[in-house]
Amino acid sequence: MKLRVNESEQVRAFLGSLAPDSRKRLRSAIHEVAAGERPLEPLTRGLAGYHKLKLQPWRMVCRYGETPNGPALFLVFAWTRDEVYELFTQLQAEQIIRSVS
């Protein structure tokens, strides 16, 4: 079964900032995941419940979920390999602090 793909604004902006060839390669990898042709690796520790899509120097943090129209793949955050998890963890912490304030 094919998953519906939902991109966050950050992922959309990140993909838009890439060169056309790089953007095309990442989009192709996303479609492979949605079609069940490419597995995602689960993340652990503070990012349990999320998965990663690896492609060259980039990483995308994703999660599986449901929409009213069926199963979906949520593309949550994307960045370069060396910074993606640290930045995403910081973003999560900021959102938690704002929700409590």
Annotate each predicted stretch with a short phrase.
Residues 28-54:
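A short, surface-exposed loop/turn module that caps and links secondary-structure elements
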Residues 10, 48, 80:
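Residues that form or immediately flank small-molecule/cofactor binding pockets and catalytic motifs
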